[in-house]
């Protein structure tokens, strides 16, 4: 994974690998905060993302793809529109690392430019490919970003670091219904423009 390319070889990524008690503590504390926000939405302001992962205002075709993905997953799991309890429980699976024994948190130094997010993304993809080569499964998760202030002291993340995302690492339960869901993909013609 460390062979991922980066602009002028800056290699701006950091990765924290958690398991055992630190992983369990993160799960407990973030799930408690997630539940508290649900009970009192005003608390959400205390858990702001370090950067805008998603746009403030969604436009087509991105909102359409997001909805298709959500409807497909929730439909498979039997979660109906408006079932806030089931939606909350499903979202909270993120903060339980989807039952994986290992969690990873990826960061970059805040002084770096936005290009370092691209570099870190290539590093993250390499981690995922390397994991599959070893018969492991991964799930990259932006859901952790809003809870960096809980996670940072547990993992020893520096104040000058920006959390990019988290990731669950383990062996997928192939018998779980959720693992039969495959996210739809647009055709190559929809995102490729041949010039010349």
Each language-model region and where it sits:
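Acidic, surface-exposed loops and disordered segments
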Residues: 2-196
């Amino acid at each position: 994974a460390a062979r991922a390319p980066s602009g002028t070889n800056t290699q701006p990524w950091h990765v924290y690998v958690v398991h055992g008690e630190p992983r369990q503590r993160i799960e407990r504390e973030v799930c408690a905060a997630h539940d508290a926000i649900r009970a009192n939405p005003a608390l959400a302001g205390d858990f702001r993302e370090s950067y805008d992962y998603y746009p403030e205002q969604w436009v087509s075709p991105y909102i359409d793809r997001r909805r298709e993905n959500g409807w497909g997953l929730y439909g498979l799991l039997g979660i109906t529109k408006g079932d806030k309890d089931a939606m909350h429980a499903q979202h909270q699976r993120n903060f339980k690392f989807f039952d994986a024994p290992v969690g990873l948190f990826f960061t970059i130094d805040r002084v770096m430019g936005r290009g370092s997010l691209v570099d870190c993304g290539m590093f993250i993809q390499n981690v995922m490919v390397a994991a599959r080569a070893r018969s492991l499964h991964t799930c990259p998760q932006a859901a952790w970003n809003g809870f960096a202030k809980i996670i940072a002291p547990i993992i020893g993340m520096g104040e000058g670091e920006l959390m990019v995302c988290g990731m669950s690492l383990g062996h997928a339960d192939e018998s779980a219904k959720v693992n039969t869901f495959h996210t739809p993909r647009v055709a190559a013609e929809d995102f490729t423009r041949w010039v010349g």
